[in-house]
Amino acid sequence: MLQPKRTKFRKQMKGRNRGLAQRGSKVSFGEFGLKAVARGRITARQIEAARRAMTRHVKRGGKIWIRVFPDKPITEKPLEVRQGKGKGNVEYWVAQIQPGKVLYEMEGVSEELAREAFALAAAKLPLNTTFVKRSVM
């Protein structure tokens, strides 16, 4: 699963996920893309589950790009532990997603097959997405 090899600090503050995606909002590698419509956060496991669903549907044909990376650590305290005594341990990593962010890209397959594959991937993700095509400038 995806996670940073090393970080400057082990734990991060919660922070806020405001605004729209300025960077990574256009399809730039493949022909088709899966774009987030809502804001939220995607765990490394969800990114991997969606990738597997797409890869299996296109039967390893074409090329897939993952455009998001989980770089934010999420901490949790163990069950039945009282509050206090410091921040919990890092349990998993998430990517914070703003509306307009392209999550996955694909090329080398037909549009119909890409739509089906992205529909399977979208079912694995906790936020609403839409299918987009590369726009020629």
From Swiss-Prot:
InterPro entries: Ribosomal_uL16, Ribosomal_uL16_bact-type, Ribosomal_uL16_CS, Ribosomal_uL16_dom, Ribosomal_uL16_sf. Residues 1-22 are annotated as: Disordered. Keywords: Ribonucleoprotein, Ribosomal protein, RNA-binding, rRNA-binding, tRNA-binding. The keyword Ribonucleoprotein applies. Signal peptide: none annotated. Residues 1-17 have a biased composition (Basic residues). It comes from the Bacteria. GO terms for molecular function: rRNA binding; structural constituent of ribosome; tRNA binding. Belongs to the universal ribosomal protein uL16 family. Binds 23S rRNA and is also seen to make contacts with the A and possibly P site tRNAs. This is Large ribosomal subunit protein uL16. It comes from Teredinibacter turnerae (strain ATCC 39867 / T7901). The gene is rplP.
